[in-house]
């Protein structure tokens, strides 16, 4: 789950990696979920522009609060199949780092 904004340069820099990860692991049950608070019309345009192939939900105070009141963006949580947060990253994180956590989780049918 990636908390981001269209005006955030590090957020924008991460998106191609998320697109690649979504494409690579979708058939194993993996989904990137973006969370943005700018509103559907802004986000839809941005998603088309960057070729985002994963869902983006509109954030609200409850969603942000559920994840510990996000204080910086991008902030990304890797969540396992049970819904447990495995790890969190604040600031730009590269695709290889995300994959190093995601790939083993997908191999483990319990996690």
Name what the model sees in each region.
Residues 8, 42, 86:
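Conserved protein kinase catalytic core
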Residues 13, 20-61, 73:
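Conserved segment of the thioredoxin-like fold in thiol-based oxidoreductases
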Residues 2, 34, 77-78:
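Hydrophobic beta-strand core positions in alpha/beta domains
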Residues 7-10, 35, 90:
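Pocket-edge positions in alpha/beta enzyme catalytic cores
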Residues 108-111:
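Non-globular targeting/processing and membrane-anchoring segments
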């Amino acid at each position: 789950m990636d908390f981001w904004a269209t005006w955030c340069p590090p957020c924008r820099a991460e998106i191609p990696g998320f697109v690649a990860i979504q494409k690579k692991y979708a058939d194993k049950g993996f989904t990137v979920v973006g969370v943005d608070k700018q509103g559907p019309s802004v986000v839809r345009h941005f998603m088309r522009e960057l070729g985002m192939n994963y869902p983006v939900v509109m954030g609200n105070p409850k969603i942000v609060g559920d994840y510990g009141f996000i204080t910086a963006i991008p902030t990304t949580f890797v969540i396992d199949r049970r819904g447990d947060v495995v790890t969190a990253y604040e600031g730009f994180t590269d695709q290889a780092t995300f994959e190093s956590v995601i790939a083993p989780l997908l191999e483990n049918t319990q996690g």
